[in-house]
């Protein structure tokens, strides 16, 4: 889908344990990824780590200029405005009071910043360029007229997330992410599902 897109986008996979930075062009990573500890318990250290990671990727690009920063973040947030947190975030407790991360990074690096939920982006990526088109291509090759356009994707890591695509559109829910956020664990009273299933 984006194989001829010459724009360079700096990426980040923001996990509760590690932050993994990269740069993509035409759907391919073009520099060696940078992995740094997330420092999720300390807001100042976490923000410094993000600036360091993005700066190292920009340095690795040399003369090539990125068009934007785009990345995934766990949990509910005001993603359209780049504000992370504002509630219970077990993987990033230092973001609990809400952090204007998108505007901070835009001001620091001078390029647009796009942030979305990690579970949502996983599901949307699989719907656009992953398993869903692969299944539909197999159906077409087999002579079937059936095509799928709905998908639910689950993510397991330090946390647990879900993304949902319905009629080829990302369903963001009413908190900018469709997931089992703070759902009580049925078999383990006192903890949420995320704490009971994550690795």
Located regions from the model:
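Short glycine-rich, Thr/Ser-proximal phosphate-binding strand/loop in the N-terminal lobe
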Residues: 2-52, 84-86, 170, 174-189
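Short helix-terminating capping/connector loops at secondary-structure junctions
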Residues: 3-4, 61-66, 144-147
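Short glycine-aspartate micro-motif
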Residues: 9-13, 66-70, 151-155, 161
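Short glycine-rich anion-binding loops that position phosphate/pyrophosphate groups of nucleotides
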Residues: 17, 74-77, 157-159
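Glycine-rich phosphate-binding loop and adjoining helix at the ATP-binding site
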Residues: 40-44, 68-69, 78-148, 187-188
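Phosphate/pyrophosphate-binding loops at sites that engage ATP/ADP/AMP, CoA/4′-phosphopantetheine
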Residues: 50-69, 112-113
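Glycine-rich phosphate-binding loop of actin/hexokinase-like ATP-binding domains
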Residues: 93, 139-199
């Amino acid at each position: 889908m984006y194989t001829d897109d010459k724009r360079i986008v700096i990426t980040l996979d923001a996990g509760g344990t590690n932050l993994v930075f990269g740069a993509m062009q035409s759907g391919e990573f073009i520099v060696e990824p940078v992995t740094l500890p997330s420092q999720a318990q300390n807001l100042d250290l976490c923000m410094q780590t993000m600036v360091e990671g993005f700066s190292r990727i920009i340095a690795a690009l040399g003369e090539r200029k990125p068009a934007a920063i785009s990345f995934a973040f766990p949990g509910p947030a005001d993603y359209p405005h780049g504000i992370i947190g504002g509630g219970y975030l077990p993987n990033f407790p230092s973001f609990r009071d809400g952090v204007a991360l998108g505007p901070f990074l835009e001001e620091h690096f001078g390029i647009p910043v796009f942030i979305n939920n990690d579970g949502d982006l996983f599901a949307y990526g699989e719907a656009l360029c992953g398993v869903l088109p692969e299944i539909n291509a197999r159906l077409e090759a087999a002579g079937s007229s059936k095509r799928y356009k709905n998908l639910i994707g689950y993510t397991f890591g330090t946390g647990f997330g879900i993304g949902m695509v319905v009629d080829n559109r990302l369903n963001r829910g009413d908190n900018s992410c469709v997931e089992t956020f703070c759902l009580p664990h049925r078999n383990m009273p006192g903890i949420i599902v995320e704490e009971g299933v994550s690795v």
